[in-house]
Amino acid sequence: MNERMVDQSMHSEETDFELSLRPTRLRQYIGQNSIKSNLEVFIKAAKLRHEPLDHVLLFGPPGLGKTTLSNIIANEMEVNIRTVSGPSLERPGDLAAILSGLQPGDVLFIDEIHRLSSVVEEVLYPAMEDFFLDIIIGKGDEARSIRIDLPPFTLVGATTRAGSLTGPLRDRFGVHLRLEYYNESDLKEIIIRTAEVLGTGIDEESAIELAKRSRGTPRVANRLLKRVRDFQQVNEDEQIYIETTKHALGLLQVDQHGLDYIDHKMMNCIIKQYNGGPVGLDTIAVTIGEERITIEDVYEPFLIQKGFLERTPRGRKATPLAYEHFAKSNEERE
């Protein structure tokens, strides 16, 4: 799958860029106000008790700031953070090596925690509840259990698929925080802040236009801003103006709803070739040349959220709103 401008997952070259933009304190974090308010209380209470923060589960769509929040939690608690991904913890020994190296109060951040193997997850249970590990050494008759005491720590788990977590793991998190898509006002503020970090001026109309097309996701907003900045610099404009912004987004094929060429390809397939549906997912996949799982996990959720697509027992179906929007878009292109 080619990387898309509106893909909510991080592109391979974006790690350093994202790191440079991330706020380090709650007061700098824009949006997610309910989560910020709750975390302020939980962190202050934990510090007053001189205890580590309770284990935190962060869940929601990609690109909304779960990794950023994990680092902010560590900064606010004034402790170190160790970051790993669920798939990288293949054996209980991998987890034991990391946990035994933590200092009291430290934060362990496990991204994609829903992808932990069952054997690693079972070792994690006593570590979360009672701060010890039971490790089996040897095999057969010579196998024996060794108990390793751990310093109190905070586990922050992040997932885009909270429903894929097992009940026992989910229940061991004392704090559950769901990140929601950002509103346009917060995205506008994020875009203006990012422009300042990049040393680029931007007019308010451009910030609003970018916010509208960012799919409620800061990662997408920052990516679009970077590309529009390219056009501004080539044009030798003193700042990003609305004319340049609209021109750039048009060439990037990101429309006013944040839909790109793949979204248009998929919806036009349903509307034009299959009379609006219902049509089976496998049929759509073959017609547009994409994998079924990619359509289901990457393309569909936003189209459904925006009211353009319905899932029915008989297949996918275009909504009246889809007919209105895509017919108009096709006329403009013609």
From Swiss-Prot:
- Which processes are annotated in GO (biological process)? DNA recombination; DNA repair
The record's listing under Gene3D superfamilies reads: 1.10.8.60, P-loop containing nucleotide triphosphate hydrolases, Winged helix-like DNA-binding domain superfamily/Winged helix DNA-binding domain
Q: Which GO terms describe its cellular component?
A: cytoplasm; Holliday junction resolvase complex
Q: Name one Pfam family in it.
A: RuvB_N
Family annotation (HAMAP family): DNA_HJ_migration_RuvB
Which family does this protein fall into?
A: Belongs to the RuvB family.
- So what does this one do? The RuvA-RuvB-RuvC complex processes Holliday junction (HJ) DNA during genetic recombination and DNA repair, while the RuvA-RuvB complex plays an important role in the rescue of blocked DNA replication forks via replication fork reversal (RFR). RuvA specifically binds to HJ cruciform DNA, conferring on it an open structure. The RuvB hexamer acts as an ATP-dependent pump, pulling dsDNA into and through the RuvAB complex. RuvB forms 2 homohexamers on either side of HJ DNA bound by 1 or 2 RuvA tetramers; 4 subunits per hexamer contact DNA at a time.
Report the protein name in the record. Holliday junction branch migration complex subunit RuvB
Upper classification of the source organism reads: Bacteria, Bacillati, Bacillota, Bacilli, Bacillales
